[in-house]
Curated annotation (Swiss-Prot):
SUPFAM superfamilies: dUTPase-like. Keywords: Hydrolase, Magnesium, Metal-binding, Nucleotide metabolism. It comes from Rickettsia prowazekii (strain Madrid E). Substrate binds at residues 68-70, 81, 85-87, 95. HAMAP family: dUTPase_bact. The gene is dut. NCBIfam families: dut (TIGR00576), PRK00601.1 (NF001862). Its EC number is 3.6.1.23. Belongs to the dUTPase family. This is Deoxyuridine 5'-triphosphate nucleotidohydrolase. CDD domains: trimeric_dUTPase. The keyword Coiled coil does not apply.
Length: 148
């Protein structure tokens, strides 16, 4: 496993908890809500939740913002644009777009763990335009074509 150094800036609304891995083999780090007051996410609605941090990722890395499984299974709270992407050249506050798919309103309290962040390396592509693609067994089959 490779460990990279990522610069992190604590913003004015920072609550004192840097993102951290919960276990030795956790892929994601928990992000906490840095809201001044409680935020209610009504059923079917979306709220943008601040985290109080900004980061400077190295070139060729991104941060992916993903749901916390416990919030999703217990309350129907998930990340609306999952996975949210934080690009290497973004320097603003990381915010999490949460949606309530549950059956009752949900309150986000200050300091609550709201999402997880995964740092991932990515590759850029150079398109090679062609009129013919190589054949595969699957072909054009999609959306359930391989079975349930």
């Amino acid at each position: 496993m490779t460990i990279i150094e990522v610069k992190i800036k604590k913003l004015e609304n920072f609550l004192g908890n840097l993102p951290e891995y919960a276990t030795e083999h956790s892929a994601g780090m928990d992000l906490v809500a840095a809201n001044e007051q409680s935020i209610t996410i009504k059923v079917g609605s979306i709220q943008l939740i601040p985290t109080g941090i900004a980061i400077a990722l190295p070139e060729s890395f991104e941060a992916q913002i993903r749901p916390r499984s416990g919030l999703a299974v217990k309350h129907g709270i998930t990340v609306a644009n999952s996975p949210g992407t934080i690009d290497a050249d973004y320097r603003g506050e990381i915010k999490v777009l949460l949606i309530n798919l549950g059956n009752k309103d949900f309150i986000i309290e200050k300091g609550m763990r709201i999402a997880q962040m995964i740092i991932a390396k990515y590759e850029r592509v150079l398109w090679a335009e062609t009129s013919i693609l190589t054949e595969t067994m699957r072909g054009r089959g999609g959306f359930g074509s391989t079975g349930l």
